[in-house]
Regions:
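Acidic, low-complexity terminal tails and accessory targeting/binding regions
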Residues: 1-7, 53, 97-109, 153, ...
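Beta-strand elements within well-structured catalytic alpha/beta cores of enzymes
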Residues: 8-12, 153-159
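GST superfamily/GST-like fold recognition
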Residues: 161-165
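Glycine-rich phosphate-binding loop signature in dinucleotide/nucleotide-binding domains
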Residues: 56-58, 146-153
Length: 197
């Protein structure tokens, strides 16, 4: 069931990093990689294009993950849309999903932990990690706080792939099965992409 919203939301995934290229086939999330994962030149360009699209949206508030690749994204966006960086709210709950002991593993090996059944990831977490449901719960908690604090505002949320995919699913009232179908059909949010809700 879709929630009734008081605000307009713009979900933006950070720009492309080395981990979104064909060269990498590993699971990552947070804690941030060592050395930290930074935007590629292509990622910076994606974000600039997103910023140009956001210019006309009159963004009132920006909420973002505190991970470096998102901070870099926010800095570029803020400059383009004329938003004061001092006003950005960085929130740890908007971080990427925590893959725990699977972080840094090959994607195929990581999915083997779930018997190659993506539906299991909604309920099942790994040691030192979290499930998709847990990730969605923390994203929705931030959304609820925003909804309780503001009305008729244009809100930009800058985060990561899985968290934004899960938040968008909640906002659109999608079932877990619908979310998996979306992922399998490569319809989840791409780097530098804006989804308007």
């Amino acid at each position: 069931m879709k929630p009734i919203l008081k605000n307009q939301y713009f979900l933006l995934r950070h720009g492309k990093t080395i981990h979104q290229t064909e060269k990498k086939n590993i699971i990552y999330g947070y804690p941030d990689n060592n050395p930290p994962c930074v935007l590629l030149k292509e990622g910076i360009e994606e974000v600039r294009l997103a910023g140009e699209k956001l210019k006309e949206k009159n963004i009132d508030y920006v909420f973002a993950s505190d991970i470096l690749r998102v901070k870099q994204t926010v800095e570029i966006i803020a400059e383009i849309i004329g938003y004061d960086l001092e006003k950005v709210v960085y929130d740890k709950r908007l971080r990427d999903i925590n893959w725990g002991i699977l972080g840094g593993k090959n994607k195929e090996d990581a999915w083997a932990y779930y018997d190659n059944d993506k539906m299991k990831k909604f309920e099942m977490s790994v040691p030192k990690g979290e499930s998709w449901n847990q990730c969605q719960e923390r994203m929705v908690a931030v959304l609820n706080e925003i909804e309780n604090s503001y009305q008729n505002k244009n809100i930009l949320i800058v985060s990561h792939g899985d968290p934004l995919w899960l938040l968008e699913g909640y906002l659109k009232g999608k079932s877990n099965r619908e979310l998996i179908d979306e992922m399998n059909n490569n319809q989840d949010i791409k780097t530098g992409e804006i989804r308007e809700i």
